[in-house]
């Protein structure tokens, strides 16, 4: 009879990480045989919810898949990769985290290794669960019109984002399942994988970890606050997966990413997430690969041109399908809103079906000019062509005016000046708050922004797009 640990974990084959482990729910007898606590939920139960399966129907690269034909991967596979990466970081950081907690909270029992690892894994799995069709484009074109839920931990006036929706889904839709988890996958040792008696993951911890911008909440356990930069820091378990995954599926050679070296030189100190100075080269190498992906894939000229067409039709199209309300106020209906639903309807509009002069919210119909643009998009006939480009690097403030000026002025309906900016490395003001650096032999390390000085703080790709004649 095979060891009980084989019954406790499924293996998922993945081109980036090799094998991704996923906990399976064990019957009471099997739990006892494996020396694990009784459980009535496991990661497979979360994976099989409608919210997670919906991510199969949301593409990872939105409009870029019309430019890179093999980039057909989804937010679902990315979420699995982030979960796996987060678990690796949890295992690596746990010994130093327990030691730092003992120094800062003497006499307090540290959380079990299983609880720490599984909390990070669930945060990684669910960090994108709030995404809508076309992912970040949905944020910009639809969600930005609505206010975020009120949260006393941040200033008011914030626009709604997919991270806000992820927090709502985690706490209100998936919270009961999350609370019932009792172990992380691993080598089958109960002392490492199982939660301690009385421990459970608080969904509020997971919601806190996935929040952006980062929340200031002293009431959160110290160890949760220390781990927050892994999901919103200089490097994250999110971008450590998507840079490699997107490069693989687009066929782009982004350069080496040595995630293991980065992990091996990371630890938790009383300052929080800390990188030993010899790991800086691996960090710089990774940030360089990330910048390359923005320049070659995410900000590709044809991708940006397609986005200009999408920007014209996206809001009225979602309005036709979903109505005028905020997704935050109707999560039940939002669960049914994915790219399959949108593109199925867009194909009907492109054929001239459900097209009227005065559509009403939620009636599934759109105006003729919107239908015409969708027809061009679905046939991959962008109506905009880049005729000039400028690239610039800068440290603070808006993009350099002299560089932008070379593109000339826009003309409504004929010329669009498109400015795409990526933060290539953290600014000097943010860097040390996100990641501490420990010098060799106890010596002070260079400030992080200085150590990464070969990378710009911001990189601009500006383009002048002109309307294609007859489009």
Task: Tell where the protein language model's regions lie, with residue ranges.
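Histidine-centered, transition-metal-coordinating active-site segments
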Residues: 1-122, 132-471
């Amino acid at each position: 009879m095979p060891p009980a640990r084989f019954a406790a974990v499924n293996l998922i084959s993945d081109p980036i990480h090799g094998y991704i482990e996923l906990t399976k729910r064990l019957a009471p007898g099997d739990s006892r045989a494996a020396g694990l606590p009784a459980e009535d939920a496991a990661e497979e139960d979360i994976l099989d919810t409608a919210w997670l399966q919906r991510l199969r129907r949301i593409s990872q690269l939105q409009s870029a898949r019309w430019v890179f034909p093999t980039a057909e991967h989804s937010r679902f596979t990315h979420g699995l990769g982030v979960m796996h990466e987060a678990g690796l970081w949890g295992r690596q950081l746990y010994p130093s985290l327990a030691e730092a907690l003992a120094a800062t909270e003497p006499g307090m029992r540290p959380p079990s290794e299983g609880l720490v690892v599984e909390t990070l894994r669930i945060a990684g799995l669910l960090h994108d669960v709030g995404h809508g069709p076309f992912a970040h484009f949905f944020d910009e074109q639809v969600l930005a019109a609505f206010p975020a839920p009120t949260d006393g931990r941040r200033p008011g006036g914030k626009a709604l984002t997919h991270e806000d929706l992820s927090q709502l889904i985690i706490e209100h839709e998936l919270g009961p399942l999350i609370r019932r988890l009792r172990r992380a996958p691993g080598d089958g040792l109960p002392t490492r994988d199982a939660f301690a008696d009385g421990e459970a993951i608080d969904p509020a911890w997971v919601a806190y970890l996935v929040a952006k911008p980062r929340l200031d909440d002293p009431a959160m356990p110290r160890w949760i606050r220390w781990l927050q930069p892994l999901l919103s820091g200089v490097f994250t378990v999110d971008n450590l997966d998507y840079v490699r995954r997107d490069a693989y599926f687009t066929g782009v050679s982004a350069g080496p990413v040595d995630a293991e070296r980065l992990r091996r030189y990371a630890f938790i100190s009383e300052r929080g997430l800390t990188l030993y100075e010899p790991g800086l080269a691996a960090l710089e190498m990774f940030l360089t690969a990330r910048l390359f992906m923005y320049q070659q894939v995410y900000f590709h000229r044809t991708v940006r041109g397609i986005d200009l067409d999408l920007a014209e039709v996206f809001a009225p199209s979602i309005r036709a399908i979903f109505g005028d309300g905020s997704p935050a106020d109707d999560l039940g209906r939002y669960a049914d809103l994915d790219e399959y639903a949108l593109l199925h309807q867009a194909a009907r509009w492109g054929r001239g079906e459900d097209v009227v002069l005065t559509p009403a919210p939620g009636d599934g119909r759109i105006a003729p000019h919107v239908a015409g643009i969708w027809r061009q998009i679905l046939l991959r006939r962008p109506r905009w062509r880049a005729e000039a480009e400028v690239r610039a690097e800068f440290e603070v403030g808006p993009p350099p005016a002299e560089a932008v000026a070379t593109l000339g002025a826009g003309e409504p309906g004929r010329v669009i000046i498109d400015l795409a900016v990526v933060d290539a490395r953290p600014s000097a003001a943010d860097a040390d708050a996100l990641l501490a650096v420990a010098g060799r032999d106890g010596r002070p390390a260079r400030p992080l922004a200085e150590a990464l000085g070969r990378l710009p703080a911001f990189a601009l790709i500006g383009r002048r797009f002109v309307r294609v004649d007859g489009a």
